[in-house]
Amino acid sequence: MSFVPPATEVLIVADCWQAESEAEAVVLRAIEAAAAMVDAETADAELAVMLSDDAGVRTLNANWRGLDKPTNVLSFPALQPSATMPDDAPRMLGDIAIAYETTRREADDEGKPFDHHLSHLAVHGFLHLVGYDHETESEAEAMEQLERRILAQLGVPDPYADQDRADQDRVN
């Protein structure tokens, strides 16, 4: 059976994203690349990506995580399907929210092209939807390695390279 990516709806809910005409295409490519690389059944699956602003993501972060501040990306994995759902109903993976101002600021601060950082955040958010996490050091290492491999497929340089160099400098 050939690979079928999840149906992905990108919702642009903040006007600030109008400055990034390719944002939707960047997100869709990143999600498809991530889905192709992970061992998760994505045929007949759906997810939504909300391109928001800091205010919208701050509200979500406060309501769902108790953190009254914006962040770059939030993921909300869907609950497992219930036995009462029809067999042919699409399987909802969940939702991802990305904050424009934080994403822009981080990309600028790190000297990265905006679309590279957006790709990274979309991949990161998707991996959370399919069960990856970074609560422990080993989980973080596994997730970061997978992110690197997916992003390399998209032609995006290692987003952790500078962090790894800084960690190495502290050790030496």
Curated annotation (Swiss-Prot):
Pfam families the record matches: YbeY
Subcellular locations according to the entry: Cytoplasm
Cofactor note: Binds 1 zinc ion.
Gene Ontology MF, one: RNA endonuclease activity
EC number of this enzyme: 3.1.-.-
Binding site for Zn(2+): 124, 128, 134
Cellular component terms per the entry's GO annotation: cytoplasm
Coiled coil location: none
Keywords: Cytoplasm, Endonuclease, Hydrolase, Metal-binding, Nuclease, Ribosome biogenesis, rRNA processing, Zinc
Keyword Cytoplasm: yes
InterPro entries: MetalPrtase_cat_dom_sf_prd, YbeY, YbeY_CS
Cofactor(s) essential for the protein: Zn(2+)
An annotated GO BP: rRNA processing
Function: Single strand-specific metallo-endoribonuclease involved in late-stage 70S ribosome quality control and in maturation of the 3' terminus of the 16S rRNA.
Protein family according to the UniProt entry: Belongs to the endoribonuclease YbeY family.
Name this protein carries in UniProt: Endoribonuclease YbeY
Lineage: Bacteria, Pseudomonadati, Pseudomonadota, Alphaproteobacteria, Hyphomicrobiales
Gene of this entry: ybeY
